[in-house]
Structure formats: C-alpha cells, structure tokens
Amino acid sequence: MGKVIGIDLGTTNSCVAVMEGGEPVVIPNSEGSRTTPSMVGFTDSGERLVGQIAKRQAITNPENTVFAAKRLIGRKFDSPEGKKAIGVSPFKVASSPNGDAWVEIRGKGYSPPEVSAIVLMKMKQTAEDYLGEQVSEAVITVPAYFNDSQRQATKDAGRIAGLSVLRIINEPTAAALAYGLDKVQDGGTERIAVYDLGGGTFDISILELNAGVFEVKSTNGDTFLGGEDFDQRLIDYLAKRFAESNNGLDLRKDRMALQRLKEAAERAKHELSSAPETEVNLPFITADASGPKHLTETVDRATFEALVTDLIDRTIEPCRIALKDAGIPAQQINQVLLVGGMTRMPRVQQKVKEFFGREPHKGINPDEVVAVGAAIQGGVLKGEVKDVLLLDVTPLSLGVETAGGVFTKIIDKNTTIPCKKSQVFSTAVDNQPLVSVHVLQGEREMAADNKTLARFELVGIPPAPRGVPQIEVSFDIDANGIVHVSAKDLGTGKVQQVRVVSNSGLSEAEIQAMISDAQSHASDDKKKKELAELRNNADGLIYTTEKSLEEYASLLSEKDREEIKADLERLKEVLNTSDAAVLKESFQRLEGSAYRIADAIYTGQAS
C-alpha cells in the first residue's frame, strides 16, 4: 500500500509531510529546505522552474514568474480580488473564455489550478525522492473559508499534478490535528481557537477536542488577507519614500525594480519580527537621465506596524463572529494556536493576546504544522492513525434563488460535514417542462450578492397543472466541502436528468489536456535532469582523464595515448549536445579507454 502525503499548498510557501512509523515527518526539498516557495518561473527555453530556483530568477524574469496563484484560484477576472491582483502583479492576469482569472505567459493562458499543479508536482517529487517510491495519493489543505469553486479548483490542481486527492482538509483543522494528536488519550474537553494568518488568506476556527474527536464548532475568515498584503504596504511605503527624493520617480512602474522591491519588503518584514529596525539597501535599482539611482531606507518596527494596523484589525471581526457562531465566549477558550508565517509578527501576537485574553500557544511551527496535520489525516484515512475522528463544517451557507431574487438558505454555515438536505420544487405555470434552479453559496440576503455555484435545469417534467409536479432536489456537501446536487421526481420516483451549467472552473476536457501537458513536461524535465547529470559526469571525467594523462603518460604506449586523446577530444566536442545518447556513447568510450591509465599505473606499481 503506497504512502499518502500531506501537502500544505500555501500562497507564499508550500510544505509536504508523510507518516512514518506512526509519526508525521516534514520532508525537506532538494535544496534542503522544509518549505518551498509557491513560485513558478517560465524560461525562454520553455523550462518550468519551481520553488527557490524560480524565486532566484524572478528579478530578471518578473513578467514570466508567477507567485501567489492561490489568490486567483476559483476567482473571476472581474471580481474585486482579480482586479486587485492585476494592480500589484508583475505578470499578466487575463480573463479565460468563461471569465475566470488566469495568468498569461508569453501569450499562453495558464489557469491558477494549472500553476498550482506545477507546485504540487514539485512537492510530489520531493516526497518520492525521500521515500524512494512512487506517490499517487495526497491530502491537500485549503483555507477554511474557501468556497466550493476554490475547493474544486484545488482538487483539479491535484489531478493535473497526477495525484488522487483523498481529502481536501481545512488548514486550521489540520493545525489542530497536529497539535492535538498526542492528546487523544487525555480526558476532558479542550476548546481551541486556531488563528491562521498566512501568505494570502486568514482563517479562524473554533474547535473542541475530546477523546480523539476533533469537532469544528465554527469557522470564519478572509480569503484575500495575508502576508502578501503586508508586503504590499511596505512596497508602497518604500516606493513613496524613493519618489519623494527622486522627482516623483515611481519604481512600481518598472517590473524589475518592483520585483527587487518585493523581495526587499519581504526580507525587511521578516527581520522586523526579531529586530527593532532594519535597513533596506537596493543599489542601482533604476536609472534616469541623471544616472543610476539607489534606494537606502531604514524602517523601524513602529513604522511598519503603523502601515499595517488596519490589516491586523481586520482579523478581529471574523474572530468575534466565529466565537458567536460557536456559542463559546473568549474566556472559555483553553488554547489559541498561531498558524501561518505572519503570526511571527509581534504586533499580531499582541493583538491575539488582547482579544482572547490569554497568551497564544507558540509550541508549534507555524510554517509546517498544516502539512503535518494533512499527513495525519492521510494516516487516519489509511487506518495508520487510530482513535481520531475529524468533524469539520461547511464555512458558507448553501441555498437557492427564490422569487424576488431572494437567497433562501438550505444548509446553514457551520453545519457539520458531510451533510445532505433536500428541498421540494414545483412548477409555476401549467405544463411547464422544466424547473430552473440557481444554486448559490454565501451569507448575503439577496441572491445577486452571493457566489453562484451552478444553474440546474430539471428537464423532462410530464405535463401537469402548476404546483402539481414535486421535484425533490438534494444538496449534498461531502467531506471535502464540495457540493453535489441530484434531483428526483417524487411523482414517478424517477431520478431526473440534471443539466449542470457551472459558471466557473475547468471543464473535464480542459483538465485532461492539462494532465497530458503536465505529464509531458514532467517527462521533459526528467530528460533535462538526466542530461545535466550526464554532462556533469562527463565534465568530471574529462578533468580527471586530462590530469591522469599528464601525470602518467610515460606509463602508456603511444597507441594507448593517442586513443585516449582522441576519445577525450570527442567527448569535449559533444559535451554541450542536447542528444543524451551521443553524449552517453562518447562518455562510455572515454571511460573505457581511460581505464587503461589505471591499468598502467597498477602494472607499473606491481613491477
């Protein structure tokens, strides 16, 4: 039975873990880091760079390096979030044929699930390198406040990456699972608040832990609030300060300068979590008619905190709503877990302490705990982890549009999932052949203000006076938080044909095309890696052979010397070829002839 990996697919960084010997293990990537930047760089040669290597080349290739794709996943191009991304991204954000927000690289459109799949493939490869076996199953985490479209898009990303996604699990729930695994046998009930402020999203979940049962009581959040926004405030501040001393020159209009600013802002933000001030020093950041320009600015913690006060304050209202929905006052919370890199900021920790009236728990790694929880859930699903039951909730209400454009809720938010509820529909006019159902998700009173999931037409209704046909529509939310709808004619007992016209997301044909594309790129990447390794080995062989030939030429016959030199020159000629077979053949020839040097040395020593 193959291993199930747990993946935290983050906005800024991703992490992968696996259960080994009953314990979760975070897997370091090929660079030795336990987290991987969620960045993808597209090079001129068509190569796709992922993680740290993509981040390193972003400054010189900003318009072809995609970051924070998770913020676009499941979103419309003309949504407020889509428009905001356009304003701050050095890469191009474009509209797909169905209006979704995609990124455009060198004239080709890539869906956010497709970009996320490239990151997931890197995490899959990281796990396979560590385990020494193929991995095909995963548990992937999402922000608790993700809607159906965003969850489905994340599942699609997993499929494109060649993974069977066994479960989509909420990030705060995963963190609670990681925190509470060693407390499964303890008696009593523990109430936990998970405050999760990551790179792109904010979640708050209230849970109760009791004898291995992890029950989510409520969840709330903001899917467009996170470290990226904190970075942006610092970018804007530095750009403004630079403009003030350089005749209004706006660095944000220069894509390369913007990327350097972004990296500097991120670094300064990290440093200000442990130091009272930091210096941002960017020489030759741009130039004008008067010559090159340099940016040097000292930023102290108080200045940074003032820039982001409103962002931190925005996290408090969801906390208040979550406690109210759970029916638990703040003083009854036993533990507050801090999750996500932004919770390292002292002002964030102080705000959490002020609101909950207690010191938050800092005994977990905020960057790794979510992946650890996902791995544990994988262990639960495979039967490796016993005596653990996870009861999560749907973050948003599910309902339909009724007369007058009103949103009628059928499944309320914070209902434990999986769950199923039904509603009976009928016809409004005589002999009506179909009933249209508009399914939505959200909390607003009017249908137009909520998120459309799909429109269903229940067709083939037998002719009858209005109000007579009884069509039962069942709404089913699975354990992944993904919505399924079925319909049944109560009069005939027949299941009605349901035509689903989803207004967003990828079609099955698009997903299959992306799977093929990903597989082809994976094959290309493997060939490139093998060629690079072969080239490195050949380069090493050339060096050692030349050195040995120079040192031990006198031990060789003239014929052997000439043959080795000929093979050496041949390998040098083909060293930069892209034909692996030609390079391998020349490598093996020189390897064989160079063996004569070792043979001659051995014979010489023996005599």
Curated annotation (Swiss-Prot):
Family statement: Belongs to the heat shock protein 70 family.
PROSITE patterns, A to Z: HSP70_1, HSP70_2, HSP70_3
Entry GO MF terms: ATP binding; ATP-dependent protein folding chaperone; unfolded protein binding
Protein's UniProt name: Chaperone protein DnaK
Function recorded in the entry: Potential chaperone for other proteins involved in social motility.
Gene3D superfamilies from the UniProt entry: 1.20.1270.10, 3.30.420.40, Actin, Chain A, domain 4, Substrate Binding Domain Of DNAk, Chain A, domain 1
Organism for this UniProt entry: Myxococcus xanthus (strain DK1622)
Domain of life: Bacteria
Induction: By stress conditions e.g. heat shock.
Gene designation: dnaK
Positions bearing Phosphothreonine: T201
Keywords: ATP-binding, Chaperone, Nucleotide-binding, Phosphoprotein, Stress response
